[in-house]
Each structure stands twice: as C-alpha cells, then as structure tokens.
Curated annotation (Swiss-Prot):
Homology family: Belongs to the histone H1/H5 family.
Any single biological process term in GO: chromosome condensation
GO CC annotation: nucleosome; nucleus
UniProt key word Oxidoreductase: no
Gene3D superfamilies xrefs: Winged helix-like DNA-binding domain superfamily/Winged helix DNA-binding domain
Protein name: Histone H1
Annotated Pfam families: Linker_histone
Organism: Triticum aestivum (Wheat)
Boundaries of every H15 domain copy: 54-124
C-alpha cells in the first residue's frame, strides 16, 4: 500500500509544470505583436497623383491680363480677375480669387510686378544688365595699366643704383677739398693785403691837405718875386 501511495503522489508535480508551461506560452505572443505594427508603418501608402491644372500659370494669366487692359495707372485686382474669369472660366477653381491675391503678392515680391496705389503694372525689362557687363570689362583693362607701372618701378631701382656712384664722386671732391682747409697760412696772407690796402687810403688822405696848401704858398712867392726883379733892373740901369 505504501508503494501505491507514492506512485499516486508522483504525477502531481507534472501537472503543475504543465500548467506553468501553459502560462508561459501566451506571454510570448504579445512580444511579436509590436513587430507586426512596425511592419505596417514601414509600408508606404499609395501617393495621390497630382492634378495638372488645365489653365496656364497665374503669372502668365496676370501678365496677359495687364498687357491686354493697357491702363496707364495700372490694373486693379478686380479688373485682372474679371479678365481671367472671362477667358478661363471653365478651368478655374472655386477659390480662384484668394489664390489670385496670393499669387499677385508673390509676383510683386519677385519683382515681376510693380504696385502703384492699389493697382499693378508689369515690371520694366532689366535694361540695366547691359551697362553692368560694360563695367565689368573696364576692370579687366586696369591690370594692363598696372603692368607698365611695374616696369617703371623696375627701372627706378636701376636708376637709383646708377645714381649711387654719382653720390660717391662728391665725396671724393670733399676729400680733395680737405687739403685746402690745411692751407690756412694763405688766409693769414689776406689780412696783410687788407692792411696794405688800408695803408694806401691812409696815405692818400694826407696828400689831399698837402694839395690844398701849395696853392696858398704859390700865391705868396709870386708877390715876393716881383719886388726882387725890380732891384735887378736898377742894377742894369747903373
């Protein structure tokens, strides 16, 4: 009887293990579910084909309307809208007016239209592009003018190099002039000549008063000579 009881107790843990295995298997299934969700997200959906409008672009329609209206002060948005509706009524969308306003603003920002007091004109053709190309050609001529300047700059150092020997020649002349400075006794001889020159005018000055005195002396001897002759005549009479 003890052996039968032991045999009856053995299958009990096997049932528990089976129950644990049954519990573990459903827990693994939710882990696979997110992978399937990722696979669904990665698959791209079919793209909707773009509907090509039957009417021309808004830039073409607006420019055509302004050119056809030919208004001096420009065409208003209402006049432009009426012209486009009359020509392309069957192909325009229901929100045509709103799209037209936004497209006109974009054309003004791009410089294709000019706004004048609530009306719009076609922008003038860029005629200023040609003068810009002419100005670009002028700077190309400047490097040519710089090339001769470099030649002259190269020649000027050669001239300076040639001028340096000339500067040395005056230095030699100064070296020759130094012996003249040594001959200072000649400079001492000059004062003697000056002293002699001073003596000459000093001697000339006494001659002037001597020249004045002789006339007075001459006048006196003439008077004395006359009475001397008279006694001589008396002797002749005797």
């Amino acid at each position: 009887m003890s052996t039968d009881v032991a045999a009856a107790d053995i299958p009990v843990p096997q049932v528990e293990v089976a129950a644990d295995a049954a519990v573990d298997t459903p827990a693994a299934k939710p882990a696979k579910a997110p992978k399937a969700a990722k696979a669904k997200k990665s698959t791209p959906g079919p793209k909707k084909p773009r509907v090509t409008p039957a009417h021309p672009s808004y830039a073409e329609m607006v420019s055509e309307a302004i050119a056809a209206l030919k208004e001096r002060s420009g065409s208003s948005t209402i006049a432009i809208g009426k012209f486009i509706e009359d020509k392309h009524k069957a192909h325009l969308p229901a929100n045509f007016r709103k799209i037209l306003l936004t497209q006109i603003k974009k054309l003004v920002a791009a410089g294709k239209l000019t706004k004048v007091k609530g009306s719009y004109k076609l922008a003038k053709a860029p005629a200023a592009v040609k003068p810009k190309t002419a100005t670009k050609k002028k700077p190309a001529a400047k490097p040519k003018a710089k090339a001769p300047a470099k030649k002259t700059a190269a020649k000027s150092p050669a001239k300076k190099a040639a001028a340096k020997p000339k500067a040395k020649a005056p230095a030699k002349a100064k070296a020759v002039a130094k012996p003249k400075a040594a001959a200072k006794p000649k400079a001492a001889a000059k004062p003697k000549a000056k002293a002699a020159a001073k003596k000459a005018p000093a001697a000339a000055t006494p001659k002037k008063p001597a020249a004045r005195k002789p006339p007075t002396k001459r006048a006196t001897p003439v008077k004395k000579a006359a009475p001397a002759k008279k006694p001589a005549a008396k002797k002749a009479k005797k």
